[in-house]
UniProtKB/Swiss-Prot annotation:
InterPro entries: Adeno_E1B_55kDa, Pectin_lyase_fold/virulence. The modification Phosphoserine is found at residues 438-439. Plays a major role to prevent cellular inhibition of viral genome replication. Assembles an SCF-like E3 ubiquitin ligase complex based on the cellular proteins ELOB, ELOC, CUL5 and RBX1, in cooperation with viral E4orf6. This viral RING-type ligase ubiquitinates cellular substrates and targets them to proteasomal degradation: TP53/p53, LIG4, MRE11-RAD50-NBS1 (MRN) complex, ITGA3, DAXX and BLM. E1B-55K probably acts as the substrate-specific adapter of the SCF-like E3 ubiquitin ligase complex. This is E1B 55 kDa protein. It comes from Canine adenovirus serotype 1 (strain RI261) (CAdV-1). GO terms for biological process: symbiont-mediated perturbation of host apoptosis; symbiont-mediated perturbation of host ubiquitin-like protein modification. One of its GO terms (molecular function) is ubiquitin-like ligase-substrate adaptor activity. It is found in: Host nucleus; Host cytoplasm.
Length: 444
């Protein structure tokens, strides 16, 4: 017991007195920074998430760590400033489409001057813009139509827009090419005009071309047409030169010429209705998942007699609803999963074998000259009501027809003979096989 009392007394003597924390004037606790001890510049450099005032509807801002750098969005700037900065410092990757300030044009404004100064133009929704003179585009151009109507008051054959490859387009993300979107090109008067002549890569997105346009799009340096509607035009799209053209999700209705391309063309998920010539393809290309339909043969433009020429008119042949011109250097175009109703397909002389896989030929005619019929392969094709004709000249008889080149030529009459030996023998080859199955189809 005495030993225990000695231990207790020793602990009492060795124990430190309790520390009394007095926080008076000028005294600060451990780890606490007194604000008036910092300068004004130091106080401004403190980083607090509450000071950013960011929209935080999902409550994720507070979960950011201190080592994350938050970049505040910059405001929009004028196109002229971006252009001047690139001329001074060279191309960069810091500018994007959303960084360019949009100019809202009103009816009556000088569109050519606005495009040159601002590049990114927005039209009023549903407004009508009278085009009294040709608009020349030399540099960057992005027009947001908002379903505005562009109505031409121009002489016959004059272009509403002429895109020239003159000025350098600044390095702006998603503004690398000329863009026309959501515009209605109207031509109600008797003057047939050209909507656009382009010598630069151009994108036409969700535009409508209505009325008797002489030529809607004259493409000379490649283009992409997406979701557009062509109604009642003489020629909807014509492509020249070595550049390719791409058409997707578009509608061609009651046009004398739909797509006329002398080079490579890619057409997919589009519809051609009552067009005298839906496609005239001079080079190689791809036609897939499209519909070609003729509902009448007596109404305009289906009653037109058309032709196409080779060698400056030295060789002229009648034009089919789908026409593959002779080209001894190019193969047959890829033709997959298309639907043809009352359509005449003309095939010139080319290399290889033509195989329209997974396509439907309903009440259609495939016409080809001598020596080409044997290169048609109808395996996995719905050809129950399809006729194959071999063409040959019928003497000296000829008629004058409108040509794809814009001139008129004397076209020789042709004699046709039915060919049946190219069909698949269904007594030997069963249709209850994987012949008509595609790996791209969903198994529903």
């Amino acid at each position: 017991m005495e030993q225990d009392s000695d231990l207790e007394s020793g602990r009492a003597t060795n124990q430190r007195p309790p520390r009394v924390r007095v926080r008076g004037a000028g005294v600060r606790g451990r780890g606490r920074v007194r604000r008036r001890a910092l300068s004004e510049g130091q106080r401004r450099s403190l980083f607090r998430l509450d000071d950013l005032q960011l929209p935080d509807s999902l409550y994720v801002t507070r979960a950011l760590q201190r080592d994350h750098a938050l970049e505040m969005p910059r405001g929009q700037v004028d196109f002229s400033l971006i252009e001047a900065e690139e001329r001074r410092a060279g191309p960069t990757d810091e500018w994007y489409f959303e960084s360019v300030k949009t100019y809202r044009a009103k009816p009556g404004d000088d569109l050519q001057t606005l495009i040159k100064n601002y590049a990114k133009i927005s039209l009023e929704c549903g407004a009508v813009y009278e085009i009294n003179s040709k608009i020349v585009v030399t540099g960057a151009c992005y027009i947001i139509g908002n379903c505005a109507v562009l109505r031409a008051n121009l002489p016959v054959g004059t272009a509403m827009f002429e895109v020239l490859n003159v000025d350098v387009i600044p390095s702006i993300g998603f503004m690398e090419r000329i863009v026309f979107s959501n515009i209605l090109f109207d031509c109600r008067s008797t003057t047939a005009v050209v909507c656009c002549i382009s010598e630069r890569n151009t994108l036409f997105h969700n535009c409508v071309f209505s009325g008797p346009h002489m030529l809607c799009l004259d493409i000379r340096a490649g283009a992409e047409v997406r979701g557009c509607h062509f109604v009642g035009a003489v020629c909807a799209l014509r492509s020249k030169g070595l550049y390719s053209v791409r058409v997707r999700n578009s509608i061609f209705e009651k046009c004398a010429f739909g797509v006329v391309s002398g080079s490579k063309a890619s057409i997919s998920h589009s519809m051609f209705k009552d067009c005298a010539c839906c496609i005239m393809l001079g080079g190689q290309g791809t036609i897939a998942h499209s519909h070609f339909m003729a509902t009448t043969c007596t109404d305009t433009p289906m009653n037109l007699q058309l032709c196409t020429c080779e060698g400056n008119g030295s060789h002229v042949v009648p034009l089919g609803n789908i026409h593959f011109a002779s080209n001894r250097e190019a193969p047959w175009p890829t033709f997959n999963a298309n639907v043809l109703v009352r359509v005449r397909l003309y095939m010139g002389r080319r290399r290889g074998v033509f195989h329209p896989k997974q396509s439907t030929f309903s009440m259609c005619v495939i016409a080809a000259p001598r020596g080409v019929v044997q290169r048609i392969y109808l395996f996995s094709v719905y050809d129950a009501t399809c006729a194959i004709l071999q063409l040959g000249e019928a003497g000296d008889a000829a008629t004058e027809r409108l040509c794809t080149c814009g001139m008129r030529h004397n076209t020789p009459s042709l004699r046709a003979a039915y060919v049946t030996d190219t069909r698949i023998d269904r007594e030997i080859n069963s249709q209850d096989t994987a012949e008509f199955f595609s790996s791209d189809e969903d198994n529903l």
